[in-house]
Amino acid sequence: EAISNMFPDRQKDFVLSINETDLVLIKELTGPADSNKEVYEIAEEIEKKLHDDLNLKCVIGIGTTAKHLRVLADKYKEAQVAIEVGKVFDTEKSIIHYDNLGIGRLIYQLPTTLCEMFLSEVFKKNPIEALDQETLYTINKFFENNLNVSETSRKLFVHRNTLVYRLEKIKKLTGLDLREFDHAIIFKVALMVKKYLNSQNGEY
């Protein structure tokens, strides 16, 4: 009801209750069809309303704009996919747009057998499980800092040579040199694939 009251124009906006926890909002947009700004503002208002009035946390999935009524079902599916993919790859985000899912959307659509095959091909020398938490943390920081050794070592509060040593250790274990762009991409995708497989097995 709190959400329905935010959209009083029943001719243009529709709030549908799917079950006890899920709602669908079909909203007429006034701005350009390809602009996500208006959509994000609406989503933020809904999130704030639920938090302030009902002390509820929510996750909002946004589909792409429907230019015709006949494609509404497809847009609803997109919003659902945005939520599902977001649960795996963007756990910190509460508002997820289908357009911004990136490579996560592609991985989500792959059969698990193909994902497992990819991991075994990438990690021929040692399985990904051979990497300890500190090493994985280092790798993620290295990616966050665009493969910049100096910047990453500064953020990790370690000497540059310490980071280089860790990267060499990763290279020995996996055969991948993360300082090389192509190797870094393969490793990044592999980490995402592993995350996806864990989610399918109920491990987050």
Protein language model annotation of sequence segments:
Residues 1-204:
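Cytosolic nucleotide-utilizing catalytic cores of signal-transduction proteins
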